[in-house]
C-alpha cells in the first residue's frame, strides 16, 4: 500500500499572526493533520479464491481539499486445500450411508413385494378370465355340434323329400308308359307281304300275296281318352 501525499491547495484559509508577532517579534506555528480510512473486501473460496482490492484515502480530501488515492492490487493464487478429517462428520457420514443403505434395501423390498402382489393379482384375474373363456368355448363347441347335427338332419330330410318327389313323378311316367303300351296292344295292326318265286329249267312260277289284318278293341277307357 502506498501512503497518501498531502498537497496544500492555494485557497487554504489564512490565519492572522498572533499579537506577539504584531508587537515586533515573529513566532511561526504550523499544524498538519493527516488521517485515512481503509476498506477491504475479501471473498474467500475454497477452490478458486477471487482477487480483492484495498483502497486508502484521506478523510480531509473527502471534504473537498483535493482527492488523491493509491490502489494496490493483490492477485489471488490457487492454494491446495486438504480435506480435514473431523470425527463428528465422519461418524455422521457413516450413519447417513448406513441409513441410505437400509432405506435403499427397504425400497427394493417394497418394490419386490408390490411387484409380486400385482403379479399374483393379475395371474388370478387371468385364471378367472381363462376359465370363463374355456367354459364359453366349450359351450360354443356344443352349439357347433348341435348346429351341424341340425344341418345334417335337414340335408337328409331334404334328400328324402327330393327322392320321394323323383319317385312320385317317375311312377307317373311309368304309369303313362304302361298305359301307352296297353293302348298300343289294344289297337293292333298287322301288315305282311308274301312273295314266292319258283324258277326252273322247264318253267318259271311266281306267286305273291298281300295280307292286311287289323283289329281294334274299344273299351270304356279308350273312349274317354279319345274324347
From Swiss-Prot:
It comes from the Eukaryota. Its main location: cytoplasm. GO terms for cellular component: cytoplasm. GO terms for biological process: response to desiccation. Residues 159-177 are annotated as: CAHS motif 2. Residues 1-28, 198-227 are annotated as: Disordered. Residues 90-140 form a coiled coil. Residues 217-227 have a biased composition (Basic and acidic residues). CAHS proteins are cytosolic heat soluble proteins that seem to contribute to the anhydrobiosis in tardigrades, but their specific mechanisms are yet to be identified. It is possible that protection during anhydrobiosis might occur via the stabilization of vitrifying small molecules such as sugars, but not via the direct glass transition of CAHS proteins themselves. Trehalose, a disaccharide essential for several organisms to survive drying, is detected at low levels or not at all in some tardigrade species, indicating that tardigrades possess potentially novel mechanisms for surviving desiccation involving tardigrade-specific intrinsically disordered proteins (TDPs). This is Cytosolic-abundant heat soluble protein 106094. It comes from Paramacrobiotus richtersi.
Amino acid at each position: 500500500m502506498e501512503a497518501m501525499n498531502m498537497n496544500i491547495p492555494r485557497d487554504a484559509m489564512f490565519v492572522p499572526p498572533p499579537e506577539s508577532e504584531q508587537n515586533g517579534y515573529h513566532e511561526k506555528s504550523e499544524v498538519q493533520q493527516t488521517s485515512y480510512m481503509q476498506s477491504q473486501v475479501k471473498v474467500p473460496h475454497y477452490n478458486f479464491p477471487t482477487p480483492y482490492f484495498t483502497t486508502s484515502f484521506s478523510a480531509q480530501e473527502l471534504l473537498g481539499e483535493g482527492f488523491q488515492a493509491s490502489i494496490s492490487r493483490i492477485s489471488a493464487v490457487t492454494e491446495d486445500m486438504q480435506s480435514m478429517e473431523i470425527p463428528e462428520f465422519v461418524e455422521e457420514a457413516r450413519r447417513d450411508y448406513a441409513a441410505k443403505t437400509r432405506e435403499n434395501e427397504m425400497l427394493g423390498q417394497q418394490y419386490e413385494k408390490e411387484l409380486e402382489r400385482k403379479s399374483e393379482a393379475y395371474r388370478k384375474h387371468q385364471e378367472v378370465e381363462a376359465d370363463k373363456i374355456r367354459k364359453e368355448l366349450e359351450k360354443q363347441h356344443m352349439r357347433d355340434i348341435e348346429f351341424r347335427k341340425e344341418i345334417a338332419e335337414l340335408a337328409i330330410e331334404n334328400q328324402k323329400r327330393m327322392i320321394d318327389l323323383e319317385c312320385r313323378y317317375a311312377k307317373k311316367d311309368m304309369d303313362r308308359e304302361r298305359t301307352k303300351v296297353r293302348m298300343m296292344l289294344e289297337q293292333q295292326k298287322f301288315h305282311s307281304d308274301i312273295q314266292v318265286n319258283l324258277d326252273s329249267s322247264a318253267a318259271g312260277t311266281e306267286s305273291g300275296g298281300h295280307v292286311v289284318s287289323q283289329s281294334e278293341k274299344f273299351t270304356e277307357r279308350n273312349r274317354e281318352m279319345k274324347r
